[in-house]
Amino acid sequence: MKERKSSKMPNNLPQLQNLIKRDSDSLIHTCFALSQFLQQLRHYQSNLQIFKLNPSHTSKVLQELVMFLCQVAHCYPGHLGSLPQELKDLLHKHHSVMDSDLRMTLCRALILLRNKDLISPTSILELFFELFRCNDKVLRQVLYTHIVTDIKNMNAKHKNNKVNSTLQNFMYTMLKDSNAVAAKKSLDVLIELYKRNVWKDAKTVNVITTACFSPVPKILVAALKFFLGSDEGSAGDDSDSESDVSYLKFEFLEMIMNSLASLLLPKHKKKHKQTSVNFSALHLINDPQGFSERLFKQLEASTGRFEVRIMLMNLISRLIGVHQLFVFNFYPFLQRYLQPHQREVTKLLMFFSQASHDLVPPEVVEPGVRTIVNNFVTERNSHEVMAVGLNAVREVCQRCPLVMTDTLLQDLAQYKTSKDKSVMMASQSLIQLFRSVNPNLLHKKDRGQPTESREDSKPLDYAAVEAKDYIPGAELINYANSTIILLYATLIPDGWETDEGCDDGSDEDGWIDVQHSSDEEQEDEDPSGENQEGEEDGQTRAARISQMRILTDEDFKKIRMKQLTKEVQPKLGKKRKRATTTEEPQGSRNELVALENIEGIYKKRKHDKASRLETVIAGRQDRPKYGTKKKAKMNEHAGTSNKEKRRKKNFMMMRHNKLVRGKTKRSFRDKQIALRDSLLKRKKSKI
C-alpha cells in the first residue's frame, strides 16, 4: 500500500506526466494535476537559478524536470510560453562548458518542442548549426539527423521558400566558419538535402561552390566529390570519422517498405512514376567560366596531396567540356603530366579529352595531341601504352576533329597492321572515326566504301555553323501520308494556285481536306509516287515537308532509322532498292568521357586452373583417345619386325656388335667440305 501511495507523489514525474496528459472530465482531477504541475515548475525555476551559478556542474534533477516540462508543454501553453527561449539561451551561452549529458538533454527537449510545433524552425535550426562547434560526436550526429529530417518535412507538401532562403543564407555564413567541424557538417547537410531532392536548386549548388575554395582539405574534398558525382557516404565523414550505421539501416528499411508498397498499392506505384528531370549540378552553376578560372588558379598554387589535385583537374575538365569554356592555360598544364610513367596517367588523358570541344582553337589542343603521340605511340613502349595513347587521341579528335593533320593521321593509321591486337583495334577505331568526320585526311585505301551520309556531310571549318532551314531526313517521308495537316485558309500564300474543280464549300469552311492516315499502305504501294519523289531534289523536298507538315514522334523515329541506314549502307544507284533496318540509332555523344574508352584495350588474360580445365575438357570432346600415331598392323596377332626389334634393343646388349664397333665418324676435313658446300648453296639460293 505504501508503494501505491508513493506513486502518486509529485516526485514521480512519469506518473504525473501521465496524469496531466490523461483526458478526464473530473474537476478535482484537473485541479490536482495543475497544482502538482505548478509545484514542479517552481522546482525547475529554482534548479535553473542554481545551475546558472555553476554551469559546469551536472544536475540530474534539472534534466528530469526539463524533459517533464517539455512533455506537458502543449497542455499548459500559458505557463510554459517562455520555456523554449530559456532553453535556447542556456545552450547559446553555456554550451561550451556544459556537461555533455545535460547538453544532449536540452537539445532533445528542443527537438521535442519543435515536433509539437511550439517553436519556430528558423531559430532552433540556427542554434543547432552553431552547436556543431561542440566537441561531441554523438550530439553532432543527432543534430544532423534532426536538421535534415525537419527541413525535409517542412518541404514535404509545398516548398517553404521563406524558411529555405533564410536557412540557405545562414549556411552560407557557416561554410566560412573558423571551426572546420561545424563548416563540414553544414556542408554535409546541404549535400544531403540536395540528394534527397529537397533543396535541388541553383542557390544550393552555388552555395556549395564556395566550399571548393576552402583551406580545409576535408571540406574541399567533400565539395569536389559532390560535383564529381561520387558524394555517396560523405555526409558522415567528419574529423572524428563518424559512422552512420543507423541511418543506413533506416534507408534499407525504407527501401524495403517502398518496394512492398509498390506491389500492394497501385496509387503508390503511380506516384513514384512521376519523377522530375534530374539535372546535373554542373548545369546549375551561375558563372561556370569564373568558377573554372578560380579553380585553375587554386590548382596551380596547390601543394596538397596528388589525389586532391586529380579531383581538381577532373572538375575543371568537366566544366570546360560541359559548358564549352575557354581556359587555354589548362591544356599546357596537363601536358606536363602526359607521360607513360606518370601516376594515374589514364585519368589525366581522360581529363585532357574532356576539356576538348569544338569551340576551342585547334592550335591550343594540337601540342597536347603531339605530346601524347610522341610519348605513348612509339615502338619503345609496350603495346598497352601504345593502345592507350591511340584511344586518347581518338577521344580528343572526336570532340575537336580539327586538331588532326593528314600526315599525323596517316602515320597513326599504319598501326592497323600491328601484330598486337590492342594496338590494331585502337588504330582501326581512329580510322573509323575519321571515315565519318573527315575522310579526306585518310589515305585513299583507308577511306572505305563511300556511303550516302558521307556524301551529304562535309567537314566544317573552325567556329563554322551549318544552319539548315529544314529537318535533315524529312525527304525520306512520303508527303502524301499526312497524319496531322490542318492549315487555315488565311495562312495560304496568295501566290498559290487553287484547283478550279474543287468544291466551294471547302473554301468557306477554311480547312483543307486531308487524306486519312489509314490510306498510307495503299499509297506506299503506288510506284508512281516513288518516281516523282526521285525526280525532286532532296533538300527542296525536305524543306517543303518541314514547312507544310507537322511531324509526329513516329515520323522522327522513321527519320532516325533511315538516317542510320544511310550511314551503314553504301551509296547505290537510284533504282536499287535496299532493306530498311529496324534497330534504334545510338544517342548523341555524352558530355563526359568514360575512363573505359581510354583503358579499353584488348588483352589476353591468363587462365586460372578452372578455366584451363574447361578448355581441356572441351577439346577432348569428339576426339579420339590419346596415344601413339603408329600405323595399325595388318594382322593384330603378328609380331614385330627385325628392324623394330633392333631399334628397341638395349644398348648395353648391342655395344659389342661389330656394326656398332665399326661405325666411323666424319673427319674434320669432311666437316669442312660439308660446311663449304652448304654455304655456297645458301648463297646461290639468295641470288
Swiss-Prot record:
Signal peptide segment: none
Chief place where the protein resides: nucleus
Biased composition (Basic and acidic residues): 667-680
SUPFAM superfamilies registered for this protein in UniProt: ARM repeat
Gene Ontology BP annotations: protein transport; ribosomal large subunit biogenesis; ribosomal large subunit export from nucleus
Subcellular location: Nucleus, Nucleolus
Biased composition (Basic residues): 644-666
Stretch list, region Disordered: 517-549, 561-587, 615-687
GO cellular component: nucleolus
Family: Belongs to the SDA1 family.
Name recorded for this polypeptide: Protein SDA1 homolog
Lineage: Eukaryota, Metazoa, Cnidaria, Anthozoa, Hexacorallia
